[in-house]
Every structure is written in C-alpha cells, then in structure tokens.
Amino acid sequence: MLRRTVSNFAMSPYMLFISDLAKTGKLKGIRTPGKFVGKKYRQLSAKEKAALQQRAKQASTPAMTAYRRMAHREMSNKSVPIEQRRANLTKKWNETKQAQREKAQKAQKKTKSAKSKVKKAAKKSKKSKK
C-alpha cells in the first residue's frame, strides 16, 4: 500500500509553481486562478520546468515525513486486518493534527507584544534623565 501512496505525498513541480505565484500575489483578483496557472505553467521554458522539478525533488514537509513514519509503524502490525489498520492510522493522524492545532492556538494566545512595556521603559528613562 505505502509503496503506491508515497508518490502521492510528494510535492509536484506544478504545486511549487502554484505556491510561488500565490506568494508573489499574482493570483489575487483573478476570477479563474486554475486556468491562469495552467496557462502560465505551460508557457514555462524547459529550463524553468527543470528548476521546478529539481526543487520538487528536494521539497519535503515535516507533516509528510511524520505521516510516513506513523503509517509505516501502524501498517506493520500484521495481526490486525488492513481495513482496521487504515482506520486506526486515520484516527491517530487526525488526533495528532488536532493536538498540534490546539497547541499552536494556545501558543498564539500566550504571545503578547512587548511594545507597551518598551514604551513605558523609554518614558521612565527619559523622566529619570531630566
């Protein structure tokens, strides 16, 4: 199973091209972005496509690696039927992702700007100099 699905997790040159366009803001305000991106991708030169393919080979996300590791570990348990293993893998992966989201939200809430404290300290230092 995993031998076939690993290629589905890999980043394609086309997806890299889309993310590059999105980062530069060229997709904003376009009514049909898929059509626009497809047209632009087909217009790329061979050198540009080769560069994208090279970047795509090197691209790997931590989530892909973590999922592969978890899938390998879960699927190696041969005493459980394959459908059950898939269900367990899906359930555990969703729980992991949910826990990560909650952790990120908590960290985001805790982080506050130090701007007001810096301003107060600057005012105190100005007053003490006078």
From Swiss-Prot:
Record localization: Mitochondrion matrix, Kinetoplast
Biased amino acid composition, Basic residues: 106-130
Basic and acidic residues bias spans: 92-105
GO cellular component, one term: kinetoplast
GO MF entry, a single one: DNA binding
Stretches for region Disordered: 89-130
Propeptide section residues: 1-10
Domain of life of the source: Eukaryota
Keywords tagged on the record: DNA-binding, Kinetoplast, Mitochondrion
Ranges in coiled-coil conformation: none
Family indicated by similarity: Belongs to the KAP family.
Record's function text: Histone H1-like DNA-binding protein involved in the organization and segregation of kinetoplast DNA (kDNA). The mitochondrial DNA of kinetoplastid protozoa consists of about 5,000 minicircles and 20 to 30 maxicircles. These circular DNAs are held together by catenation into a highly organized compact disk structure referred to as a kinetoplast DNA (kDNA) network. Binds preferentially to a specific fragment of minicircle DNA and is able to compact kDNA networks through DNA charge neutralization and condensation.
PANTHER family: DNA-ASSOCIATED PROTEIN, PUTATIVE-RELATED, KINETOPLAST DNA-ASSOCIATED PROTEIN
Assembly: Associates with the kinetoplast DNA network.
Protein name: kinetoplast-associated protein 2-1
Taxonomic source organism: Crithidia fasciculata
Gene: KAP2-1
